[in-house]
């Protein structure tokens, strides 16, 4: 039995069509993001060699992720990661996905935080807000005596943080 081989272009087009048919708003972008996630191939590499064949293992992984995304599962829950304030955070279905809007909260907090303060992050979820504040404060002063604690009622969320 002959194995199914697909090129980058074929796989990407199939993924984008499937997501479009499922009503995903940014179908082409999401299909690209998942292709890059599975293969590790950048856009530059894609355009340099669009007919590169993809291993059967990666084809299956990509098709699985496309199927999940077509059921409107968020990309971040599929990949398990989300960038926030320049840092990559692990996320899953037990925490809210960090949003760019929330980065403003971190920026505003950094304006009023002073050395020696203690921070309590209630409903910490992924921990991205507290971690970002502590990390950025340390980068700003090279040394920081800030203390922080994240708490959450959800054991599953705390396992993520």
Locate predicted features.
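Conserved AdoMet
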Residues: 36-112
């Amino acid at each position: 039995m002959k194995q199914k081989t697909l090129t980058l272009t074929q796989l990407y087009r199939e993924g984008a069509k499937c997501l479009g048919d499922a009503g995903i708003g940014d179908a082409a972008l999401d299909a690209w993001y998942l292709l890059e996630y599975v293969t590790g191939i950048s856009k530059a590499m894609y355009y340099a060699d669009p007919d590169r064949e993809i291993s059967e293992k990666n084809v299956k992984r990509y098709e699985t992720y496309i199927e999940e995304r077509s059921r409107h599962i968020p990309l971040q829950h599929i990949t398990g990661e989300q960038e926030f304030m320049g840092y990559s955070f692990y996320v899953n279905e037990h925490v809210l996905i960090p949003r760019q809007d929330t980065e403003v909260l971190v920026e505003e907090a950094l304006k009023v935080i002073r050395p020696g303060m203690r921070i309590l992050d209630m409903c910490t979820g992924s921990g991205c807000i507290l971690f970002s504040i502590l990390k950025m404060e340390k980068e700003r002063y090279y040394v920081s005596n800030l203390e922080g604690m994240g708490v959450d009622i959800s054991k599953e969320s705390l396992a993520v943080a």
